[in-house]
Structures are given as structure tokens and as C-alpha cells.
Amino acid sequence: MSLQVNSVAIMLVVLILLGVLSNNNSITISALILLLMHQTFLGKYIPFLEKNGLKVGIIILTVGVLAPLVSGKVQLPAFKEFLNWQMFLSIVIGIAVAWFAGRGVNLMSSEPIVVTGLLIGTVLGVAFLGGIPVGPLIAAGILAVILGK
């Protein structure tokens, strides 16, 4: 087996180092998995990940968010609690973020050039500001609104 040293491999190694230095397992593990796939016979599955990874990731994220409701650790609020301003604001913000993410997916599909900048910004936010890597969709959605897309 020979290693492929190219800009993609170097970028993934840099991401792994950033993830380790910032103690961010999400970046470290993701970049490590992709580097291993890129450097081995598993590379043939990268197009599958590219096509379906976002959908699968959103499903896993949604399961993780809903799991505390199912386990009973978080109780569903009583109807009267839906009438307070914090619950109302939470619902409105949830709707807005979902709308931004939908716009973001469309922008990322129609203008792939913005993906690089969004990914760099997201990685920096994850690595140094303690964020989580759902940022590209939201960032792309906000960018889409700013660009009038």
C-alpha cells in the first residue's frame, strides 16, 4: 500500500491536528475516518458518503436529540407551558434555524465554491470556539439570505 500525498490528505492531517489540539473529537474522528478511507480501498465508498452522509448524520443527530424524551430524562411540557414566552421564542427560533438550514443545503448544492469557506469557518469555530459541526448548513442558509438566493 502506498500513501497518496496530495492536498486532500494534507488538509485532513491538518484537521486531525486541529482536532487533537483543540480537544475536539468530532473533527479528529471525522477527519481520521476520511483520511483512512482516502488512503485505502475504502475510498470507493466516499461518493456514497458524499451523497448520503448529510442525511444519515441529520438522522443520527435527530435521534440523539429525541432520545432524552423517549428515555424520560426530559419530560414533555404540559400544554400551559407552551404558552409562555420562552417556549414560544424557542419554537420560533427552531423554525428559523430549520428554514436557514434548508436554504443552506440549496446554496451549497448550487454554488459549491462557498462550501470551502463555510467548511473552513466551521472547522475554526469547532476547533477554537467549542462549536459543533452543524454550522455549515446554518451558515450557508444565512449566506443564502444575504445573497438573496
From Swiss-Prot:
The keyword Cell membrane applies. It is found in: Cell membrane. The chain crosses the membrane at residues 10-32, 56-76, 82-102, 126-146. It comes from the Bacteria. Keywords: Cell membrane, Membrane, Transmembrane, Transmembrane helix. InterPro entries: UPF0756_TM. The keyword ATP-binding does not apply. It holds the Pfam family DUF441. GO terms for cellular component: plasma membrane. It is a multi-pass membrane protein. Belongs to the UPF0756 family. This is UPF0756 membrane protein MS1439. It comes from Mannheimia succiniciproducens (strain KCTC 0769BP / MBEL55E).
